[in-house]
Amino acid sequence: MGKRHQARELALKVLFQLESSEDDPEEVLRYHAAEGAATSDVAHFAGQLVRGVIANQEKLDGILSATSEHWKLEQMAKVDRIVLRIAVYEITIDRHVPTKAAINESIELAKTFSGEEAGRFVNGILGRVAASVT
């Protein structure tokens, strides 16, 4: 498993916990990084993702609302919503990763943490996001 994949997985765990708590993001990141024995590179990239998603959540949710036909954000499974936020951040704001790579990584995370059906769901929404960006 590559460093970026590990970092996305770490960011997902951190953002998942933060979704339903008022905990300090940096403390949660340090906790999960230590628990998973993440390297400094992995923790650094995960931190960038976490901070980017938090800082841009309103914009990310707006993009997701506009591209997730027939699905309100609050109806989505929590893990799917967070996977989508990370991907939309990478595709529309960060832009350091090729869109296809961000989508493929997100599909894999969704399948791992939410199931096969979630992978198809995430793929469909991110396909629309990517089409709206290019």
Where are these regions (language model features)?
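N-terminal interaction/assembly modules
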Residues: M1-G119, N123-T134
